[in-house]
């Protein structure tokens, strides 16, 4: 199994998946603003090929402010103000990775292109309404993504931040992969143990031990 088509082709034919796409399409047609734009919903898969995934960072649902979401968890487009959770991720990187300096932008495309799958468990959201698409069925699809990676790839790093992401731990075989958990990087919880978790250096140590090129976290 080498491609997303191999891993997810059957899933995308399932009635529930077609129903999700139809529901989102109907909302857009009715004039509801949905983020990210239709062309960006599956960006994480476009930028990070199945056979090149090294690490998975799990988010919840997309940013719901104008111009922010572009299909990569935690990331925003160039020119958009860095959201608080991402700024905390940068602060942790600054103390964890030698030579990392906080960039002036929040675009994580460079990570995605190196094999960091920035996966939201829900792939769309209504403008201004967090979790508004939580019940559409996206999680059935993204759970399959996690399962397929865990089953058909070896030595991946899964970063699960916050209780919601950590519920996905049960989908991953810890014998074959590294599972790193910490509180969410949001300002509400980062001080409870996200700061100091050193997930980024731990990920690179694990990858190197298994003969896999480490990730250049610098942006």
Swiss-Prot record:
One of its GO terms (molecular function) is uracil DNA N-glycosylase activity. It is found in: Cytoplasm. One of its GO terms (biological process) is base-excision repair, AP site formation via deaminated base removal. Its EC number is 3.2.2.27. The active site is at 61 (proton acceptor). It comes from the Bacteria. It catalyses: Hydrolyzes single-stranded DNA or mismatched double-stranded DNA and polynucleotides, releasing free uracil. It is an enzyme of class 3 (hydrolase). GO terms for cellular component: cytoplasm. Pfam families: UDG. Keywords: Cytoplasm, DNA damage, DNA repair, Hydrolase. Belongs to the uracil-DNA glycosylase (UDG) superfamily. UNG family. Excises uracil residues from the DNA which can arise as a result of misincorporation of dUMP residues by DNA polymerase or due to deamination of cytosine. This is Uracil-DNA glycosylase. It comes from Neisseria meningitidis serogroup C (strain 053442). The lineage of its organism: Bacteria, Pseudomonadati, Pseudomonadota, Betaproteobacteria, Neisseriales.
């Amino acid at each position: 199994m080498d491609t997303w088509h191999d891993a997810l082709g059957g899933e995308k034919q399932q009635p529930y998946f077609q129903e999700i796409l139809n529901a989102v399409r109907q909302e857009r047609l009715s004039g509801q603003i949905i983020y990210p734009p239709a062309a960006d919903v599956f960006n994480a898969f476009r930028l990070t090929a199945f056979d090149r995934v090294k690490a998975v960072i799990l988010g919840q649902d997309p940013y719901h402010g104008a111009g922010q979401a572009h299909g990569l968890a935690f990331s925003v487009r160039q020119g958009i103000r860095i959201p608080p959770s991402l700024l905390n991720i940068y602060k942790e990187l600054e103390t964890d990775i030698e030579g990392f300096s906080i960039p002036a932008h929040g675009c994580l495309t460079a990570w995605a292109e190196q094999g960091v799958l920035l996966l939201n468990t829900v792939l769309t959201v209504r403008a201004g309404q967090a979790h508004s698409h939580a019940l559409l069925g996206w999680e059935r699809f993204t759970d399959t993504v996690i399962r397929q990676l865990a089953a058909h790839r070896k030595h991946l790093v899964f970063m699960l931040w916050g209780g919601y992401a950590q519920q996905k731990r049960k989908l991953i075989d810890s014998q074959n992969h590294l599972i790193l958990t910490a509180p969410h990087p949001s300002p509400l919880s980062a001080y409870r143990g996200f700061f100091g978790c050193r997930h980024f250096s731990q990920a690179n140590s694990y990858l190197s031990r298994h003969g896999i090129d480490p990730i250049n976290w610098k942006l």
